UniProtKB/Swiss-Prot annotation:
Source organism: Yarrowia lipolytica (strain CLIB 122 / E 150) (Yeast)
Pathway: tRNA modification; 5-methoxycarbonylmethyl-2-thiouridine-tRNA biosynthesis
Molecular function in Gene Ontology: nucleotidyltransferase activity; sulfurtransferase activity; tRNA binding
GO biological process: protein urmylation; tRNA thio-modification; tRNA wobble position uridine thiolation; tRNA wobble uridine modification
Subcellular locations according to the entry: Cytoplasm
Record-given protein name: Cytoplasmic tRNA 2-thiolation protein 2
Gene from which the chain derives: NCS2
GO cellular component terms attached to this protein's record: cytosol
Keyword tRNA processing on entry: yes
Domain of life: Eukaryota
Function: Plays a central role in 2-thiolation of mcm(5)S(2)U at tRNA wobble positions of tRNA(Lys), tRNA(Glu) and tRNA(Gln). May act by forming a heterodimer with NCS6 that ligates sulfur from thiocarboxylated URM1 onto the uridine of tRNAs at wobble position. Prior mcm(5) tRNA modification by the elongator complex is required for 2-thiolation. May also be involved in protein urmylation.
C-alpha cells in the first residue's frame, strides 16, 4: 500500500482526505473529537481527594436542530461522558442537556419531533432532552402591534394583554428572509431562557453546534441583514459570562471543523440516520432563496476547493469588539433585545439614504415624479401617529420589518413596562 493511500497517523487504510492529509476512520474520529475536547477542557471529573469524586460542577446545554452539525456535537459530548464513566467508575465531569426548539408549526420536519427525540434518547443514554415549542415564546406575553411606514418610522398602534400566535406573527411577514430572521430571534430567546433556568441549579454553559462553515455563513448573513452588531455576541466564544450578552458562557466547540467533514464523522460514528431535514427544500431559483440559504449555498460550493475561506471569515470576525461595550444608556430592542441607543438606528439610516430623487428630465419622468409625490404624501405620518409611542428598534429589526405595514410581536412585560421603554 502506498504512502499516499495510508493514514498519516497510523498507516491504516485511508477513509477520508481532508486538510491535505489522509485519515483512517478511528484517527479521523479522534482528530475531530480532540477539537471538541479542547473547547470543553473544563468538563473534567473533579476529585476532593484521591478516590473521592465530586459531583459534576458544570452543565452543558447543547441546542439541537436534528441537523448534522448539532448531532455531531451531541455525539462528541456524549462520547466524552461515556469515557469518563468507564474510566472513573460511572463518574461524570458535567451533565449534558440537549434542547430542541420545535419550529414545526412554521417549518415542519420529515418526522415528528417526539419520535426523533425518542430515538435520540435510546442512542444517547447519558443525555437529557428537552423539547420546547416555538409558541412558548408567546406564552404569558403581551402583544405589541407596530405600524411601520416606508420611511422606516414605526409607531405602537396597539398593546394587548392577549398573546399573539406563531401563525399570526408569520402571516404579517412578507419575505422568506424576514421570516427566518424572526424565527431565529425567537429560537435564540427560548434557548437562552432555558439555559438561565437550568443555570439556577447548576452553572450552565451553552455549547452551540455551529461548525466553522456555519459560523462563516452566520457572519456574512448577519452583516447583510443589518445585524453586524450581533456578530460579537453570536459568532465569538464567550467563556466569561461577563463578556456574553446573555450573561452565560457561550462556546463553539466545532469552530475548527468544516461542514463537509461533519457527515463523514457522523457516518463513521453510525449516527447519520438520526439526522432529520425539514419538509421544505431550498428553491433551485437563486432569486427565491433567503439570505441564509444563499450564504449556505455559497460556502458549500467553495469550501471543498478553498477550505481556508470559511476559517478566514471566522478569524476575522473574532477580531471584532463589542460595538456597545463603551456606550451608556442603551435599552433593549423591542424585537431582538439587542442593546441599542434610542433613535440612533433610524437617524443613521436616514443620514445614509438618498431621500430626494434627481430632477425629472422627460414628461414621463415628470408624471412618475408627481405620482410618487402623491403616494408619499398619502403615506406621511399624520398628527395621530405623531402622538403614538415610538418603539425602540435596532437597525437590523427596522430592515427586517421594512416590507411590513403592520407587525405584531410578543413582549414579556406589562403595558406600563412597555410604555416606559418607548419614546413619547
Amino acid at each position: 500500500m502506498s504512502a499516499e493511500s495510508t493514514c498519516r497517523r497510523c498507516d491504516g487504510p485511508t477513509a477520508i482526505k481532508t486538510r491535505q492529509a489522509n485519515f483512517c476512520q478511528p484517527c479521523f474520529i479522534t482528530f475531530i473529537q480532540q477539537k471538541q475536547r479542547k473547547a470543553m477542557e473544563g468538563c473534567k471529573v473533579l476529585f476532593a481527594r484521591p478516590g473521592c469524586v465530586l459531583p459534576p460542577a458544570i452543565n452543558i446545554l447543547v441546542p439541537i436542530s436534528f441537523g448534522q452539525s448539532s448531532l455531531a456535537l451531541l455525539d462528541m459530548a456524549h462520547a466524552q461522558l461515556e469515557e469518563q464513566a468507564k474510566t472513573y467508575e460511572n463518574a461524570a465531569g458535567f451533565t449534558l442537556n440537549a434542547v430542541f426548539i420545535d419550529c414545526s408549526e412554521a417549518d415542519p420536519l420529515e418526522k415528528e419531533p417526539n419520535q426523533i427525540i425518542s430515538e435520540l434518547e435510546k442512542r444517547f443514554a447519558h443525555a437529557k432532552f428537552t423539547c420546547i415549542p416555538l409558541s412558548k415564546a408567546f406564552e404569558g406575553a403581551s402583544s405589541v402591534t407596530l405600524k411601520h411606514n416606508r420611511d422606516y418610522t414605526s409607531f405602537v398602534s396597539g398593546i394587548s394583554e392577549e398573546p399573539t400566535s406563531v401563525q399570526q406573527l408569520l402571516s404579517c411577514i412578507g419575505t422568506k428572509s424576514a421570516r427566518e430572521d424572526i424565527i431565529s430571534v425567537l429560537q435564540r430567546h427560548l434557548i437562552i431562557e432555558e439555559a438561565k433556568k437550568q443555570n439556577e441549579s447548576l452553572p450552565t454553559t451553552v455549547a452551540w453546534g455551529h461548525n466553522a462553515t456555519r459560523l462563516a455563513e452566520l457572519t456574512l448573513s448577519l452583516t447583510i441583514k443589518g445585524r453586524g452588531n450581533r456578530i460579537h455576541a453570536q459568532v465569538l466564544e464567550h467563556k466569561n459570562p461577563k463578556d456574553s450578552i446573555s450573561g452565560l458562557p457561550e462556546i463553539h466547540p466545532l469552530n475548527d471543523v468544516l461542514s463537509y467533514e461533519i457527515p463523514f464523522y457522523n457516518s463513521f460514528r453510525n449516527v447519520s440516520d438520526l439526522a432529520v431535514d425539514t419538509v421544505s427544500k431550498p428553491s433551485q431559483v437563486t432569486k427565491n432563496l433567503s439570505i441564509d440559504q444563499l450564504m449556505h449555498q455559497y460556502f458549500e460550493n467553495i469550501q471543498t476547493n478553498f477550505p481556508s475561506i470559511a476559517s478566514t471569515v471566522v478569524r476575522t470576525a473574532a477580531k471584532l469588539d463589542d460595538p456597545n461595550a463603551a456606550k451608556q444608556g442603551l435599552t433593549p430592542c423591542l424585537i431582538c433585545a439587542s442593546p441599542v441607543d434610542p433613535n440612533q438606528s433610524l437617524a443613521w439610516l436616514t443620514n445614509i439614504t438618498v431621500n430626494e430623487p434627481a430632477a425629472p428630465e422627460t414628461e414621463e419622468e415628470e408624471e412618475l415624479s408627481k405620482k410618487a409625490h402623491m403616494e408619499k404624501s398619502q403615506e406621511k405620518t399624520g398628527d395621530a401617529d405623531r402622538h403614538l409611542p415610538v418603539p425602540n428598534l435596532c437597525y437590523g429589526c427596522i430592515i427586517t420589518i421594512r416590507d411590513t405595514d403592520s407587525f405584531t410581536f410578543p413582549k414579556r412585560a406589562s403595558k406600563q413596562d412597555i410604555l416606559d421603554e418607548f419614546t413619547l
